[in-house]
């Protein structure tokens, strides 16, 4: 079945959790605005986390002789006018926020292909952007595969080849082939440039062919693996009075259309024709005493009085109420952006009415990006399931009843309202241009710098057990630029249930040599512990972990001085810190042009003597 700009293949496949969910696993084995229609395809608002998870995924897939294609390169952070909008982004922001996930993926995993985006970057289409596709991707990072276009993203095939875009998708019916031949004949396209593009494509074809092997697979085993992954991705956001886990002896009201028809994947080109999609209603008898009422439909925002009345009656006869809420498919998808961060009004209204029955209410959310929660202070529990793949219902039920311990952590900040988002005044732009005016202050970098109250911070997530941290140590008190600093600490499970803890390592620049975020995630580790068990966790920090991108020197730079090393349970919950001194012999030179001041030159040891010799009598 062929459609415009896409191919829908009618095969059954196992649908694993979407990127919005897997990012919350913080398990190795960029989000700008919460309104972006394809946020469910993005791993995290944090470039370090996104890069590490992407590299691990690529290495795993390609170990099976299956190629990966990372996309969309670059600054493709909205669906509105995505075919033509120009993302206006300064180089420091690109290098620190929007490039690192791609850079890490390339350097650590070498994906077979990179897909360039539809949009323009600072005025030039990504498919024709030589600085992007050749200078940065190949020369700076060492990418060895081929670059392909997004579907129909080629504007000028010859310019694309010259820039480093090798493969056009889905093809032009021969029109661009003729343009290439003509350009070679006229001399505007060098034959060796064309040959290089062909060689890059053939190298991947040969790599696959030489390692091709027959594989057997089991949809049932893969479904169980999807359930296992989904359990690792679920984030417990609230658990007041230990309302969770549920007991099999309690009478539970199961409310909401998503309990019968879970939203488990995003719309558009990422859609999977799934093998099997169990729902909570089908599974309820395997877990406890549960009664179901629909309450609302899942295909929009239509209030239906009869459904609400039935839900309130069923809920009134229960001990606890579990509401399966979320965003309908039509609220977020490829090709358009969200208009707001709200759940459908019919869902919010029903949740509020349920909280007034005097029974504990737990909300399970199915959504691809943050939502506002006007009822957050009135419910007892919140379980963020995201778009958890075809086995998400099984995973959610396991979490609700304590058969699994939640260990997911938010890979993005949940602001209290849309207006708090740093891109609010500039998204989605106007007149085919969007200005990334917030610069490097994206996600928690912005909220933490502003000391802004948020609904739930980056890295946040609860467990059914408790963990304590102790004995934070670093292997050196002073390091040189070439050194790797090793950070170690002990983590103890002080609760009564086995669980996994996500230890987050943040770095804070105390040299004040440039405008920097309050702290940035620079490493993390997952550790599974039995009750009473203690393990030592060690993480490394290299020079890049301390550095920022200096656009004047065109390089990463970390000033000599003091840096704070912090261990946190989220970007806001910092448990312990220590300090290290970085000794950097490389001094930042002032930019010498018509705007340089004498004071700038005198502040730099490498230019001060020169200035003194010429100014002193």
Residue ranges and their predicted role:
Residues 1-547, 562-567, 571:
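Glycoside hydrolase catalytic-domain context in secreted enzymes
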Residues 596-617:
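Conserved, compact domain cores that house catalytic/ligand-binding motifs in diverse enzymes
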Residues 583-603:
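Low-complexity, Pro/Ser/Thr- and charge-rich linker/hinge segments at domain boundaries
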Residues 542-587:
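Terminal connector regions
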